[in-house]
Design a protein with these regions (language model features):
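Activation segment signature within eukaryotic-like protein kinase domains
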Residues: 191-192
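Catalytic-loop of the protein kinase fold
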Residues: 203-220
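Juxta-kinase regulatory segment immediately upstream of eukaryotic protein kinase catalytic domains
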Residues: 2-68, 76
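A conserved loop-to-beta-strand element in the N-lobe of protein kinase catalytic cores
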Residues: 149, 158-166, 174-175
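Conserved activation segment of eukaryotic-like protein kinases, specifically the C-terminal portion
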Residues: 245-253, 257-274
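Glycine-rich ATP phosphate-binding loop
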Residues: 86-119
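Terminal C-lobe "cap" of eukaryotic-type protein kinase domains
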Residues: 347-352, 356-372
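Activation-segment/catalytic-loop signature of the eukaryotic protein kinase fold
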Residues: 154
Length: 384
Protein backbone atom coordinates (compact mmCIF):
# COMPACT_ATOMS: atom_id res chain seq x y z
CA UNK A 1 0.00 0.00 0.00
CA UNK A 2 2.75 2.48 0.95
CA UNK A 3 4.73 1.65 -2.20
CA UNK A 4 1.64 2.12 -4.39
CA UNK A 5 0.96 5.49 -2.76
CA UNK A 6 4.57 6.53 -3.32
CA UNK A 7 4.46 5.51 -7.00
CA UNK A 8 1.21 7.42 -7.46
CA UNK A 9 2.80 10.53 -5.99
CA UNK A 10 6.12 10.05 -7.81
CA UNK A 11 4.27 10.01 -11.14
CA UNK A 12 1.56 12.59 -10.32
CA UNK A 13 1.32 15.70 -12.48
CA UNK A 14 0.75 19.24 -11.29
CA UNK A 15 -2.79 19.00 -12.70
CA UNK A 16 -3.40 15.84 -10.63
CA UNK A 17 -2.43 17.78 -7.50
CA UNK A 18 -4.65 20.72 -8.40
CA UNK A 19 -7.55 18.26 -8.50
CA UNK A 20 -6.49 16.58 -5.23
CA UNK A 21 -7.78 19.43 -3.11
CA UNK A 22 -7.14 23.09 -2.29
CA UNK A 23 -3.57 24.20 -1.51
CA UNK A 24 -2.54 23.87 2.12
CA UNK A 25 0.18 24.99 4.48
CA UNK A 26 3.08 22.67 5.32
CA UNK A 27 2.58 20.34 8.27
CA UNK A 28 4.69 20.79 11.42
CA UNK A 29 7.36 18.26 12.30
CA UNK A 30 7.13 16.51 15.64
CA UNK A 31 8.97 17.78 18.67
CA UNK A 32 12.72 17.17 18.69
CA UNK A 33 13.89 14.65 21.27
CA UNK A 34 17.17 15.30 23.04
CA UNK A 35 19.25 13.49 25.63
CA UNK A 36 21.33 14.98 28.43
CA UNK A 37 24.98 15.49 27.49
CA UNK A 38 27.71 14.43 29.88
CA UNK A 39 31.19 15.81 29.15
CA UNK A 40 34.16 14.11 30.84
CA UNK A 41 37.91 13.50 30.74
CA UNK A 42 38.74 9.80 30.97
CA UNK A 43 41.23 7.03 30.24
CA UNK A 44 40.84 5.44 26.80
CA UNK A 45 42.27 2.16 25.50
CA UNK A 46 43.79 1.91 22.05
CA UNK A 47 43.01 -1.77 21.22
CA UNK A 48 45.58 -1.84 18.41
CA UNK A 49 48.60 -0.83 20.52
CA UNK A 50 47.25 -1.73 23.96
CA UNK A 51 48.16 1.76 25.20
CA UNK A 52 46.08 3.78 27.66
CA UNK A 53 45.67 7.48 27.08
CA UNK A 54 43.96 10.14 29.15
CA UNK A 55 41.83 12.27 26.84
CA UNK A 56 39.51 15.23 27.30
CA UNK A 57 36.25 16.30 25.71
CA UNK A 58 34.45 12.95 25.70
CA UNK A 59 30.67 13.39 25.33
CA UNK A 60 27.96 10.79 25.87
CA UNK A 61 24.31 10.62 26.85
CA UNK A 62 23.65 10.51 30.58
CA UNK A 63 20.66 8.23 31.09
CA UNK A 64 18.28 9.07 33.97
CA UNK A 65 18.42 5.47 35.20
CA UNK A 66 22.27 5.60 35.22
CA UNK A 67 22.58 2.64 32.87
CA UNK A 68 25.87 2.53 30.91
CA UNK A 69 25.98 4.68 27.77
CA UNK A 70 25.75 2.97 24.39
CA UNK A 71 28.67 4.94 22.96
CA UNK A 72 30.63 8.12 23.41
CA UNK A 73 32.16 10.73 21.13
CA UNK A 74 35.74 11.90 21.54
CA UNK A 75 35.49 15.39 20.04
CA UNK A 76 38.48 16.37 17.91
CA UNK A 77 39.46 18.86 15.25
CA UNK A 78 37.35 21.70 13.95
CA UNK A 79 35.98 21.13 10.46
CA UNK A 80 34.08 24.34 9.77
CA UNK A 81 32.11 27.17 11.30
CA UNK A 82 28.33 27.21 11.09
CA UNK A 83 25.76 29.91 11.79
CA UNK A 84 25.15 28.73 15.37
CA UNK A 85 28.63 27.51 16.28
CA UNK A 86 31.05 24.98 14.86
CA UNK A 87 31.26 21.51 13.28
CA UNK A 88 33.91 19.12 14.63
CA UNK A 89 35.13 15.62 13.84
CA UNK A 90 34.61 12.91 16.47
CA UNK A 91 36.02 9.45 17.13
CA UNK A 92 33.47 6.90 18.31
CA UNK A 93 34.29 5.22 21.63
CA UNK A 94 32.94 1.95 23.00
CA UNK A 95 32.10 1.53 26.69
CA UNK A 96 34.28 -1.14 28.38
CA UNK A 97 32.63 -1.35 31.81
CA UNK A 98 36.04 -0.88 33.43
CA UNK A 99 36.30 1.70 36.20
CA UNK A 100 39.95 2.52 35.46
CA UNK A 101 39.82 2.56 31.64
CA UNK A 102 36.14 2.98 30.78
CA UNK A 103 36.43 3.63 27.03
CA UNK A 104 37.94 1.98 23.97
CA UNK A 105 38.74 3.65 20.66
CA UNK A 106 36.91 2.31 17.58
CA UNK A 107 37.49 2.95 13.88
CA UNK A 108 34.14 4.77 13.65
CA UNK A 109 33.90 8.50 12.98
CA UNK A 110 31.14 11.02 13.42
CA UNK A 111 30.61 14.74 12.97
CA UNK A 112 29.05 16.95 15.62
CA UNK A 113 27.41 20.31 15.05
CA UNK A 114 27.94 22.21 18.30
CA UNK A 115 25.33 24.99 18.50
CA UNK A 116 25.24 27.69 21.17
CA UNK A 117 21.85 28.18 22.85
CA UNK A 118 22.60 31.90 22.98
CA UNK A 119 23.13 32.01 19.19
CA UNK A 120 20.00 29.92 18.65
CA UNK A 121 17.94 32.41 20.64
CA UNK A 122 19.43 35.34 18.72
CA UNK A 123 19.03 33.87 15.22
CA UNK A 124 16.07 31.48 15.48
CA UNK A 125 13.89 33.90 13.51
CA UNK A 126 16.25 33.45 10.52
CA UNK A 127 16.89 29.71 10.74
CA UNK A 128 15.66 27.23 13.32
CA UNK A 129 18.07 24.40 14.18
CA UNK A 130 15.43 22.79 16.40
CA UNK A 131 13.27 22.29 13.32
CA UNK A 132 16.25 20.81 11.46
CA UNK A 133 16.80 18.33 14.31
CA UNK A 134 13.11 17.39 14.26
CA UNK A 135 13.22 16.88 10.50
CA UNK A 136 16.38 14.77 10.64
CA UNK A 137 14.93 12.60 13.40
CA UNK A 138 11.76 12.18 11.35
CA UNK A 139 13.75 11.24 8.24
CA UNK A 140 15.80 8.74 10.28
CA UNK A 141 12.76 6.87 11.63
CA UNK A 142 13.04 3.26 10.54
CA UNK A 143 16.82 3.47 10.10
CA UNK A 144 19.50 5.45 8.31
CA UNK A 145 19.22 5.89 4.54
CA UNK A 146 22.50 5.73 2.56
CA UNK A 147 21.71 8.87 0.55
CA UNK A 148 20.14 11.18 3.16
CA UNK A 149 21.99 12.43 6.23
CA UNK A 150 20.49 11.01 9.41
CA UNK A 151 21.01 11.45 13.13
CA UNK A 152 23.17 9.42 15.50
CA UNK A 153 22.41 11.34 18.72
CA UNK A 154 21.01 14.71 19.75
CA UNK A 155 22.24 15.87 23.17
CA UNK A 156 22.13 19.12 25.11
CA UNK A 157 23.51 20.83 28.19
CA UNK A 158 23.11 24.34 29.56
CA UNK A 159 25.32 25.91 26.88
CA UNK A 160 25.04 23.81 23.73
CA UNK A 161 22.80 21.76 21.48
CA UNK A 162 24.86 18.89 20.05
CA UNK A 163 23.82 17.19 16.80
CA UNK A 164 25.85 14.03 16.07
CA UNK A 165 25.80 12.74 12.49
CA UNK A 166 27.64 10.23 10.28
CA UNK A 167 30.99 11.53 9.06
CA UNK A 168 31.59 12.24 5.36
CA UNK A 169 35.29 12.57 4.64
CA UNK A 170 35.47 13.68 1.01
CA UNK A 171 33.81 17.10 0.93
CA UNK A 172 30.80 18.19 -1.08
CA UNK A 173 29.88 17.49 -4.69
CA UNK A 174 30.39 21.11 -5.66
CA UNK A 175 34.06 20.68 -4.75
CA UNK A 176 34.28 17.71 -7.13
CA UNK A 177 32.86 19.82 -9.98
CA UNK A 178 35.21 22.70 -9.20
CA UNK A 179 38.19 20.38 -9.38
CA UNK A 180 37.08 18.67 -12.59
CA UNK A 181 35.73 21.75 -14.39
CA UNK A 182 32.83 19.62 -15.63
CA UNK A 183 31.96 15.93 -15.45
CA UNK A 184 31.93 13.40 -18.28
CA UNK A 185 28.39 12.09 -18.67
CA UNK A 186 29.01 8.67 -17.05
CA UNK A 187 30.35 10.40 -13.93
CA UNK A 188 27.44 12.87 -13.83
CA UNK A 189 25.04 9.94 -14.17
CA UNK A 190 26.78 8.11 -11.32
CA UNK A 191 26.10 11.00 -8.93
CA UNK A 192 22.71 11.97 -10.37
CA UNK A 193 21.25 8.49 -9.81
CA UNK A 194 22.30 8.59 -6.15
CA UNK A 195 20.79 12.04 -5.72
CA UNK A 196 17.53 10.68 -7.17
CA UNK A 197 17.63 7.89 -4.57
CA UNK A 198 17.97 10.51 -1.84
CA UNK A 199 14.99 12.40 -3.29
CA UNK A 200 13.03 9.17 -3.46
CA UNK A 201 13.54 8.63 0.27
CA UNK A 202 12.48 12.20 1.04
CA UNK A 203 9.35 11.81 -1.08
CA UNK A 204 8.49 8.52 0.62
CA UNK A 205 8.67 10.41 3.91
CA UNK A 206 6.53 13.23 2.50
CA UNK A 207 9.30 15.83 2.78
CA UNK A 208 10.31 18.66 0.44
CA UNK A 209 13.98 19.57 0.93
CA UNK A 210 13.69 23.13 -0.50
CA UNK A 211 17.46 23.71 -0.62
CA UNK A 212 18.80 21.01 -2.94
CA UNK A 213 22.22 22.02 -4.31
CA UNK A 214 25.63 20.53 -5.07
CA UNK A 215 26.87 22.22 -1.89
CA UNK A 216 24.31 20.19 0.05
CA UNK A 217 25.51 16.82 -1.26
CA UNK A 218 28.33 15.34 0.80
CA UNK A 219 30.51 12.45 -0.34
CA UNK A 220 31.68 9.72 2.02
CA UNK A 221 34.71 7.47 1.78
CA UNK A 222 32.77 4.90 -0.25
CA UNK A 223 31.90 7.48 -2.96
CA UNK A 224 28.30 7.68 -1.81
CA UNK A 225 26.34 10.91 -2.27
CA UNK A 226 24.47 12.03 0.86
CA UNK A 227 21.80 14.77 0.90
CA UNK A 228 22.35 17.10 3.86
CA UNK A 229 21.03 20.33 5.40
CA UNK A 230 17.35 19.89 6.19
CA UNK A 231 17.08 23.30 7.84
CA UNK A 232 14.65 24.65 5.22
CA UNK A 233 12.66 21.49 4.50
CA UNK A 234 8.88 21.24 4.59
CA UNK A 235 6.55 18.45 5.62
CA UNK A 236 4.23 18.13 2.64
CA UNK A 237 0.44 18.14 3.20
CA UNK A 238 -1.65 15.29 1.77
CA UNK A 239 -5.38 14.91 1.23
CA UNK A 240 -7.03 13.05 4.10
CA UNK A 241 -9.08 11.00 1.60
CA UNK A 242 -12.37 11.47 3.45
CA UNK A 243 -13.38 14.97 4.53
CA UNK A 244 -11.24 17.06 2.20
CA UNK A 245 -9.02 17.92 5.12
CA UNK A 246 -5.24 17.65 5.35
CA UNK A 247 -3.24 14.61 6.45
CA UNK A 248 0.38 13.49 6.27
CA UNK A 249 2.06 10.99 3.95
CA UNK A 250 0.76 8.04 5.99
CA UNK A 251 -2.75 8.67 4.58
CA UNK A 252 -1.63 6.97 1.34
CA UNK A 253 -3.28 9.68 -0.77
CA UNK A 254 -2.11 12.32 -3.23
CA UNK A 255 -0.19 15.26 -1.84
CA UNK A 256 -1.53 18.81 -1.99
CA UNK A 257 0.00 21.91 -3.46
CA UNK A 258 1.54 24.26 -0.88
CA UNK A 259 0.50 27.87 -0.35
CA UNK A 260 3.10 30.45 -1.48
CA UNK A 261 5.99 31.03 0.94
CA UNK A 262 8.90 33.44 1.12
CA UNK A 263 11.56 32.19 -1.34
CA UNK A 264 14.56 30.46 0.21
CA UNK A 265 17.52 28.46 -0.99
CA UNK A 266 20.50 29.28 -3.21
CA UNK A 267 19.55 31.69 -6.04
CA UNK A 268 20.74 29.51 -8.97
CA UNK A 269 18.61 26.59 -7.83
CA UNK A 270 15.26 28.25 -6.98
CA UNK A 271 12.38 27.45 -9.32
CA UNK A 272 10.56 30.29 -11.12
CA UNK A 273 7.26 29.74 -9.29
CA UNK A 274 8.99 29.94 -5.90
CA UNK A 275 10.86 33.09 -6.94
CA UNK A 276 7.56 34.75 -7.91
CA UNK A 277 5.92 33.51 -4.70
CA UNK A 278 2.47 34.30 -6.10
CA UNK A 279 0.89 30.90 -6.73
CA UNK A 280 0.81 27.53 -4.93
CA UNK A 281 3.73 25.22 -5.62
CA UNK A 282 4.44 21.50 -5.61
CA UNK A 283 7.08 20.69 -3.00
CA UNK A 284 8.35 17.67 -4.91
CA UNK A 285 8.55 19.55 -8.23
CA UNK A 286 10.73 22.33 -6.83
CA UNK A 287 13.23 19.75 -5.52
CA UNK A 288 13.33 18.14 -8.98
CA UNK A 289 13.91 21.57 -10.53
CA UNK A 290 16.90 22.14 -8.27
CA UNK A 291 18.16 18.63 -9.06
CA UNK A 292 18.04 19.49 -12.77
CA UNK A 293 20.15 22.58 -12.09
CA UNK A 294 22.61 20.35 -10.22
CA UNK A 295 22.84 18.03 -13.24
CA UNK A 296 23.30 21.02 -15.56
CA UNK A 297 26.24 22.28 -13.48
CA UNK A 298 27.80 18.81 -13.34
CA UNK A 299 27.61 18.43 -17.13
CA UNK A 300 28.40 22.00 -18.16
CA UNK A 301 30.58 23.32 -15.34
CA UNK A 302 28.55 26.52 -15.05
CA UNK A 303 25.14 27.43 -13.62
CA UNK A 304 22.43 27.93 -16.26
CA UNK A 305 21.46 31.38 -14.90
CA UNK A 306 21.66 33.65 -11.89
CA UNK A 307 17.90 33.66 -11.27
CA UNK A 308 15.15 31.73 -13.07
CA UNK A 309 13.40 34.96 -14.06
CA UNK A 310 12.22 36.37 -17.37
CA UNK A 311 14.74 39.21 -17.03
CA UNK A 312 17.62 36.72 -17.33
CA UNK A 313 18.31 36.08 -21.06
CA UNK A 314 19.72 32.62 -20.35
CA UNK A 315 16.57 31.61 -18.52
CA UNK A 316 14.43 33.00 -21.35
CA UNK A 317 16.36 30.93 -23.88
CA UNK A 318 15.96 27.69 -21.91
CA UNK A 319 12.30 28.43 -21.12
CA UNK A 320 11.66 28.74 -24.86
CA UNK A 321 13.29 25.36 -25.61
CA UNK A 322 16.73 26.68 -26.55
CA UNK A 323 18.93 24.79 -24.05
CA UNK A 324 20.98 22.98 -26.72
CA UNK A 325 21.40 26.20 -28.72
CA UNK A 326 22.62 28.05 -25.63
CA UNK A 327 25.18 25.34 -24.86
CA UNK A 328 26.47 25.38 -28.45
CA UNK A 329 27.00 29.14 -28.11
CA UNK A 330 28.98 28.45 -24.92
CA UNK A 331 30.99 25.73 -26.70
CA UNK A 332 29.85 23.30 -23.96
CA UNK A 333 27.72 20.83 -25.85
CA UNK A 334 26.31 17.70 -24.21
CA UNK A 335 24.68 14.60 -25.67
CA UNK A 336 21.19 14.96 -27.20
CA UNK A 337 19.76 12.63 -24.54
CA UNK A 338 21.23 14.68 -21.68
CA UNK A 339 19.95 17.89 -23.26
CA UNK A 340 16.49 16.34 -23.70
CA UNK A 341 16.35 15.35 -20.01
CA UNK A 342 17.43 18.80 -18.82
CA UNK A 343 15.08 20.63 -21.16
CA UNK A 344 12.11 18.59 -19.92
CA UNK A 345 13.05 19.02 -16.24
CA UNK A 346 13.58 22.77 -16.63
CA UNK A 347 10.26 23.73 -18.17
CA UNK A 348 9.03 27.00 -16.73
CA UNK A 349 5.48 25.75 -16.25
CA UNK A 350 5.48 23.05 -13.52
CA UNK A 351 2.51 21.42 -15.31
CA UNK A 352 4.86 20.46 -18.14
CA UNK A 353 7.87 19.23 -16.15
CA UNK A 354 8.87 15.61 -15.69
CA UNK A 355 7.85 13.84 -12.49
CA UNK A 356 10.33 11.86 -10.42
CA UNK A 357 9.16 8.60 -12.00
CA UNK A 358 9.52 10.04 -15.51
CA UNK A 359 13.04 11.24 -14.71
CA UNK A 360 14.04 7.80 -13.38
CA UNK A 361 12.98 6.06 -16.63
CA UNK A 362 14.42 8.66 -19.00
CA UNK A 363 16.80 7.00 -21.52
CA UNK A 364 19.76 9.10 -20.34
CA UNK A 365 19.32 7.90 -16.74
CA UNK A 366 18.84 4.27 -17.84
CA UNK A 367 21.82 4.29 -20.24
CA UNK A 368 24.14 1.38 -19.46
CA UNK A 369 27.34 2.87 -20.86
CA UNK A 370 28.95 2.71 -17.44
CA UNK A 371 31.87 4.74 -16.18
CA UNK A 372 34.58 4.58 -13.55
CA UNK A 373 33.76 5.43 -9.96
CA UNK A 374 35.06 8.98 -9.50
CA UNK A 375 37.96 9.78 -7.24
CA UNK A 376 37.75 12.28 -4.39
CA UNK A 377 39.49 15.65 -4.51
CA UNK A 378 43.01 15.66 -3.18
CA UNK A 379 42.05 17.10 0.22
CA UNK A 380 39.70 15.88 2.90
CA UNK A 381 37.01 18.17 4.21
CA UNK A 382 33.61 17.85 5.86
CA UNK A 383 31.08 20.50 5.05
CA UNK A 384 27.66 20.49 6.69
Amino acid sequence: MEELAFLENASASFVDLEMSGPPANPLPFGRATTGRAERVDAMVLNPVTGEHLEVSNIIYERHPDRRPPDRAYWVGRKLKKCIFGVVKECTLLRFRNDALVPWEVTSGKAAVKIMSWQKIRELQHIEDPIKEVSAMQYISEGGQHPHVMGVLDVLKDEEYLLLFMPFCSSGDLFGFVQQAGRFPEPMARYWFMQILEGLTHLQKKGVCHRDMSLENILVDEYRTAVVIDLGMCLRVPYDDGETGGVADVSAGTLRRLINPLIPCGKPNYISPEVLKSEVPFDGFAIDLWATAVMLFIMLVGLPPWEFAREEDPRFRMVARGGLERMLRSWNREISPLAADLLQKMLREDPRQRLSLEEVKVHPWVLYEGGGAVPQAPGHEEWRG
